[in-house]
């Protein structure tokens, strides 16, 4: 059963957990332009500027057994890594080739000397990796629906429904399951849906309020219906635009963390 987000929020003091567990932190929860949006005076953007609120572009850091896995490298990556105390990154997964999900990889230039392992579907790596020849990295193709071990966790990619090849993922460790799928419509294939069920934590695309429909994303009503169908124990929206009010009950917040 879905629960209001406010009832599930964890205080920072509750997040000191065994390193063998997954610590999942959303480094950003915004869409391609972030919130507040440049040159916008809507209520949400005004409130953001008045109260110092932000939604940086969506990416996720997972810490597990001393290793750090980054999902997507946004244009806000430098700020996001500083906010999270800039841990050493052992692996990166690119979900797809839209600029707000991978162009921040350039921020690793002269920051991390070791070769960075970058995972993703073959077509995603071909496109994104070709732009960053100046950064030492190793590209490791991952086929959808085939589990692989990344940073000591079992990761399985599955396709979403977007205007470019895009992949969500199921990540398992120590008997817990995290499912992440952004930049997709709700009409996901049955094969993908089968991997998304019964997650301990589910993060979904929720870019617009109910009644606003576009061809390549879910609105929040779509996301809520899907989360209920998938029987998620805990559910939040990410990749939100400036049209989503700050008090929306399933809105994740930048730098919010969970321990699984």
What are these regions (language model features)?
Residues 4-7, 15:
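Cationic, low-complexity basic patches in intrinsically disordered or flexible, solvent-exposed regions
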Residues 8, 19-83, 166-182, 201:
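Conserved beta-strand hairpin/beta-sheet module of binuclear metal-dependent hydrolase folds
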Residues 18, 115, 119-167, 173-174:
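Metallo-beta-lactamase
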Residues 62, 146-151, 257-260:
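Short acidic-hydrophobic surface loop/beta-edge motif
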Residues 65-120, 198-201:
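Active-site metal-binding motif and surrounding structural segment of the metallo-beta-lactamase
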Residues 70-74, 90-98, 120-121, 179-184, ...:
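Active-site neighborhood of phospho(di)ester-bond hydrolases with catalytic His/Asp-centered motifs
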Residues 74-77, 99, 123, 160-165, ...:
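Short beta->alpha connector loops
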Residues 188-201, 206-260:
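Binuclear metal-ion centers of metallo-dependent hydrolases, dominated by the metallo-beta-lactamase
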